[in-house]
C-alpha cells in the first residue's frame, strides 16, 4: 500500500486550567489518543458536536498547536513538534469557515494569492502573477477579479479565493474547517462541487471538519465521529451512514436536519443547461 499522506498515532491534547477560590486546578482532555491514516486523493470527514475535539484535532494536524502526546507523519515523515520546518508547514494548508477574517482587506486578491509564492519560492514577479491568475481560473473566477479587494466579493467568491490561496504552494493535504457552514445552501453546493472537481483534477487530499451531516455524506470517503475527545466511530461513508454502530452516532444522525445536497446540485445543473 502507498505511504499515507497523513498518519496520526495516538494523538492527545491536554489543557491545564488554573484553579481559584474553592476551585481546584484540573486537566481538560480535549483529544484522547486519536489515530487514523489518510491516503492521497481521499477525504476524511471529522464530525461531532461543539466541544467534541474536532477543532483541537484540526489545530494539531495543521501544526498550529503541538500535541501533548502522540505522533503526526506527513508523507511518511514524522513531524517534530518542537521544531516545525517551513517545508513541513507548506505541506498542510487550512481553509477557515469565515474567509473574510483571513483575507487582508487592504490587499488586492492577486497579491493575496501571490504572497505565499513570494515568501516561499524564488519565482519571478511575472511567474507569480501567472500562477495566481491560473489559480483564479481554476476556482471559477477570472482575470477581472485579480485587482479587486476582498469586500468586493460575495461570501462564496471569498471562499473560492481562500481555497485558491491554500493551493498555491501545492500542499500535501488541506484541512477544511467548516468551509461551507456560513454559506447559503445553493452556494454550499457550488463550493462542494468545486472541491470535488479540484480533488479529481489534482488528486487533492482533504480533512473536512463539519457538523453538517448532509454535507459530510456528499463530500466524504471516510467518516470519523468524535465525542468528548474520543473517536467513537470510524469507517467508510456508506458504512457509517448506512449502519452506524455507536449510540452517539445514532443520536447525532437522528438529531440532524437533513438537507438534500444532491437535489440542489441537480437543480443547479439544470439551470446551467438552460442558460447555455
PLM regions: where:
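Conserved ABC ATPase "signature" region
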Residues: 126-144, 253-254
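Helix-to-loop junction immediately C-terminal to a conserved catalytic motif
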Residues: 62
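ABC ATPase "signature
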Residues: 234-235
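ABC ATPase NBD coupling module
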Residues: 20-25, 78-93, 111, 119, ...
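A short, proline-enriched helix->beta-strand linker immediately N-terminal to the Walker B motif
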Residues: 168-172
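Conserved ABC ATPase signature
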Residues: 149-153, 157
Amino acid at each position: 500500500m502507498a505511504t499515507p499522506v497523513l498518519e496520526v498515532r495516538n494523538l492527545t491534547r491536554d489543557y491545564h486550567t488554573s484553579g481559584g477560590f474553592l476551585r481546584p486546578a484540573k486537566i481538560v482532555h480535549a483529544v484522547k489518543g486519536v489515530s487514523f491514516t489518510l491516503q492521497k486523493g481521499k477525504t476524511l470527514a471529522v464530525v461531532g458536536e461543539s466541544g467534541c475535539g474536532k477543532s483541537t484535532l484540526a489545530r494539531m494536524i495543521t501544526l498550529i498547536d503541538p500535541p501533548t502526546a502522540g505522533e503526526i507523519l506527513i508523507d511518511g515523515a514524522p513531524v517534530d513538534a518542537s521544531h516545525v520546518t517551513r517545508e513541513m508547514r507548506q505541506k498542510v494548508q487550512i481553509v477557515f469557515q469565515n474567509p473574510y477574517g483571513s483575507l487582508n482587506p487592504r490587499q488586492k486578491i492577486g497579491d493575496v494569492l501571490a504572497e505565499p509564492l513570494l515568501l516561499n519560492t524564488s519565482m519571478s514577479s511575472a511567474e507569480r502573477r501567472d500562477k495566481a491568475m491560473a489559480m483564479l481560473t481554476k476556482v471559477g473566477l477570472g482575470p477581472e477579479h485579480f485587482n479587486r479587494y476582498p469586500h468586493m466579493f460575495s461570501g462564496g467568491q471569498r471562499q473560492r479565493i481562500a481555497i485558491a490561496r491554500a493551493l498555491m504552494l501545492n500542499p500535501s493535504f488541506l484541512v477544511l474547517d467548516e468551509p461551507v457552514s456560513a454559506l447559503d445552501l445553493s452556494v454550499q453546493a457550488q463550493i462542494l462541487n468545486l472541491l470535488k472537481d479540484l480533488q479529481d483534477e489534482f488528486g487533492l487530499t482533504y480533512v473536512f471538519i463539519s457538523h453538517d451531516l448532509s454535507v459530510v455524506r456528499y463530500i466524504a470517503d471516510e467518516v470519523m465521529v468524535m465525542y468528548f475527545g474520543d473517536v467513537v466511530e470510524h469507517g467508510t461513508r456508506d458504512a457509517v451512514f448506512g449502519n452506524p454502530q455507536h449510540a452517539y452516532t445514532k443520536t447525532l444522525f437522528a438529531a440532524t436536519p437533513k438537507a438534500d445536497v444532491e437535489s440542489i446540485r441537480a437543480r443547479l445543473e439544470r439551470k446551467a443547461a438552460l442558460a447555455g
